[in-house]
Amino acid sequence: MTLRLDSLKANKGARRRKLRKGRGIAAGQGASCGFGMRGQKSRSGRPTRPGFEGGQMPLYRRVPKLKHFPLVNPKHFTVLNVSALKDLKDGATVNLDSLVKDGIVTSPKHPLKMLGNGELTVKNLTVQASAFTTSARTKIEAAGGTCETLD
């Protein structure tokens, strides 16, 4: 048998007959058309709109609007307070590699950000970090050190 356009047939069960609702009991979907006896879901003009709860205040109006959506690509930092630099020698150069080597930071996974919590007793530090808070920068520079921002 050759394959031609006039010899094509759909597979058995692939073409189902359209249900004709409300056309008599012999059709199987007569009278109530499969919508049950009474109630709002059996009436014409159905269905109710999405989110409608029968007149009760719907959930999407009961719950407050969401504010402050999270950032899609937030910046992650390894944060360190200036009080953690108290064990270093005067005039030392501080960067992420030296902090890992000294055991102050455990993992160099993210760039370093210096925070200004605590007191800085070490003098003349050269701190190389990706970001500084204003208080950290003022405390390091007040102790005679310099802040170098890395890219």
Swiss-Prot record:
Keyword Transferase on entry: no
Family the entry assigns: Belongs to the universal ribosomal protein uL15 family.
Organism: Synechococcus sp. (strain CC9902)
Name of the protein: Large ribosomal subunit protein uL15
Quaternary structure and partners: Part of the 50S ribosomal subunit.
Gene3D superfamilies xref list: 3.100.10.10
Keyword Ribosomal protein: yes
Pfam families on file: Ribosomal_L27A
